[in-house]
Regions:
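Basic/Trp-rich segment in TM-proximal cytosolic loops or flexible interdomain/linker regions
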Residues: 17-26, 200, 267-426
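Detector for methionine-enriched segments
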Residues: 1, 56, 90, 133, ...
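Alpha-helical membrane-embedded segments
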Residues: 1-14, 367-370
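Internal catalytic domains of large membrane-associated glycosyltransferases
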Residues: 6-10, 16-296
Length: 426
C-alpha cells in the first residue's frame, strides 16, 4: 500500500508541475525510422484484429511524418476455421488500403514456445530491415499521433532501447469491465505518472503498445529457459519484464511515457476471464524470483521482478493471516469473529473499540488503501472538462462509490483465486 500511495503522490506532483511548465517543441526527428507494427495473434477474432489494424494504417497513411510504417500479422492460430477467416480478413485489408501500404501476414503451423519465439522469428527473418518495431497485442489500438510520437521519441533518444506507453482500457460493456475501465482512466494516471518519475530510465515493459529498437532487442534480449521448483527447464511466460531487464543490463534505457495519449487495449469482460488471465500472469511472475539473482541486472529491474511476484504472494499471505487469526480466536473468551453467543443467539455482540487509537489506525489503513483512488478522483472533480466527460459531478461521484463497493466485493474472491493460482504454480 505504501508503494502505491507514494507513487500516486509523486504522480500528482508531476502532474501539477507539468501544468505549470510550458512544454518545449520538439525539432523534426533526427532520423527517419522504418517501423514495423508487429501483431502476434492466437485464435483471436479476426474482425477485431484486422479492424484495429485497418484503423491504425488508415490514420498513419495521412499522418504528417517522415517515418515509414509496415504491418506484420504474426499468427499462431491452430484452429483451421479461424485461420481461414484470418486469410479472408487479410485479403479484405489488402484491398481496402492504398496500394503502397506494406502488409505481411504469416502463420506458423506449430505455435512452438508461444509469443517470445514469434518475435524472435520475426527479428531473425525481417528485423534487419526495420530500425524499430511497435509490438501490439491482438486487442491493441493506437492512434496515429501516439504511434508517431513514440517513433519521434525513439529517434530523438539514441540511448533508448524501449519506450512503453500507458494503455487506457476501452470497449467495456459488462459491469466488471466497466469497473476496470473506470478505475484505469480515473485512478490509473497518478500511478502511471509516479511510475514514470521514479523509474526514470529503468522502466518496465508490459509486452505491448511499446516501441523497441530492433537492433538493441536482437543483441541482448534473447530469453533463456528457467528451472522450475521440480528442476525442469521451463519457458519464461511473463517475458516482458525479463526483456526489459536484459535491455537495461546491456546499457539501453527503458523509458515509460505516461503522457502519450491514444494508446488503448481491451479488458476481460467478466470476472472468470480476468481470473483465467491472472492465473497465467501469476505463474509467469513467480518465475521471476528465479531470475532476480541474474548477474548484471540493474537494481530497479530486480525490483520490478520482485514486485510483480510479491503482488501475487500477498494473497496467500493474507489468507494465511486470516486463518491463523480465526484459529487463535477460537474460544469463548478470545473469539474475535463470533458475533453471537448461547445467551444471546439472535442479537449480535459487536466488537468493542477500546479507545480512539483503534479508530485512528482503522482510518489510516483505509486511507492508505483508498489514497490513489481519492487522488485521481479529486483531480477529475477539479477539472470542468473531466466532469463534463463523466456526465457531471453527481454521476462521477456515483460511479466512484460504485467502483469502491465492487472492488471491496471482488477482493475476497480475487484473494482466494490468486492463492489457488500461486499453489498451482509451485
Amino acid at each position: 500500500m505504501s508503494l502505491s500511495v507514494s507513487t500516486a503522490t509523486l504522480g500528482l506532483v508531476s502532474f501539477w508541475l507539468k501544468r505549470r511548465i510550458s512544454s518545449a517543441t520538439w525539432p523534426p526527428p533526427l532520423t527517419v525510422l522504418d517501423v514495423a507494427l508487429v501483431v502476434p495473434i492466437y485464435n483471436e477474432n479476426p474482425s477485431d484484429v484486422f479492424g484495429n489494424a485497418t484503423a491504425m494504417l488508415e490514420e498513419l497513411h495521412v499522418a504528417k511524418t517522415g517515418h515509414k510504417f509496415s504491418l506484420f500479422i504474426l499468427s499462431d492460430t491452430q484452429d483451421p476455421q479461424i485461420a481461414a477467416q484470418e486469410l479472408r480478413a487479410m485479403i479484405i485489408l489488402r484491398n481496402t488500403l492504398p496500394y503502397d501500404t506494406i502488409i505481411y501476414s504469416r502463420r506458423r503451423a506449430q505455435n512452438t514456445a508461444r509469443k517470445p519465439v514469434i518475435i524472435r522469428d520475426w527479428i531473425e527473418g525481417w528485423g534487419g530491415g526495420y530500425e524499430a518495431m511497435l509490438v501490439l497485442d491482438a486487442d491493441s489500438l493506437m492512434s496515429s499521433s501516439a504511434i508517431v510520437t513514440m517513433a519521434d521519441e525513439l529517434s530523438h533518444d539514441p540511448s533508448a532501447g524501449l519506450i512503453q506507453s500507458c494503455p487506457n482500457l476501452f470497449g467495456a460493456k459488462t459491469l466488471f469491465a466497466r469497473m476496470q475501465q473506470f478505475s484505469n482512466v480515473t485512478f490509473g494516471w497518478p500511478l502511471a505518472e509516479g511510475l514514470a518519475l521514479w523509474a526514470n530510465r529503468e522502466g518496465n515493459y508490459w509486452g505491448h503498445n511499446a516501441i523497441i529498437r530492433t537492433a538493441a532487442f536482437a543483441s541482448c534480449a534473447g530469453l533463456p529457459r528457467v528451472k522450475s521448483i521440480r528442476g525442469k527447464d521451463k519457458l519464461i511466460l511473463s517475458h516482458d519484464f525479463v526483456e526489459a531487464g536484459l535491455l537495461r543490463r546491456a546499457g539501453w534505457a527503458v523509458r515509460f511515457m505516461s503522457s502519450i495519449e491514444g494508446s488503448y487495449e481491451e479488458t476481460p469482460a467478466t470476472l472468470v476471464d480476468y481470473v483465467l488471465r491472472d492465473r497465467r500472469w501469476c505463474q509467469g511472475n513467480l518465475q521471476h524470483l528465479r531470475i532476480v539473482p541474474t548477474v548484471g541486472l540493474h537494481a530497479v529491474s530486480r525490483f520490478h521482478l520482485v514486485h510483480g511476484a510479491v503482488s501475487y504472494l500477498l494473497s496467500p499471505a493474507w489468507f494465511i493471516l486470516l486463518m491463523v487469526w480465526a484459529l487463535l480466536s477460537n474460544g469463548d473468551e478470545t473469539n474475535g469473529i463470533s458475533y453471537f453467543s448461547a445467551s444471546s443467539p439472535k442479537m449480535p455482540i459487536w466488537p468493542h473499540m477500546s479507545n480512539v487509537n483503534s479508530l485512528i489506525i482503522l482510518l489510516f489503513m483505509y486511507g492508505m488503501l483508498l489514497a490513489p483512488k481519492i487522488i485521481g478522483a479529486i483531480v477529475m472533480l477539479a477539472s470542468s472538462d473531466s466532469r463534463r466527460k463523466y456526465g457531471g459531478s453527481l454521476q462521477f461521484t456515483a460511479s466512484f462509490l460504485l467502483e469502491i463497493f465492487t472492488s471491496f466485493a471482488y477482493a475476497p474472491i480475487l484473494m482466494i483465486q490468486q492463492t489457488i493460482a500461486v499453489l498451482r504454480s509451485l
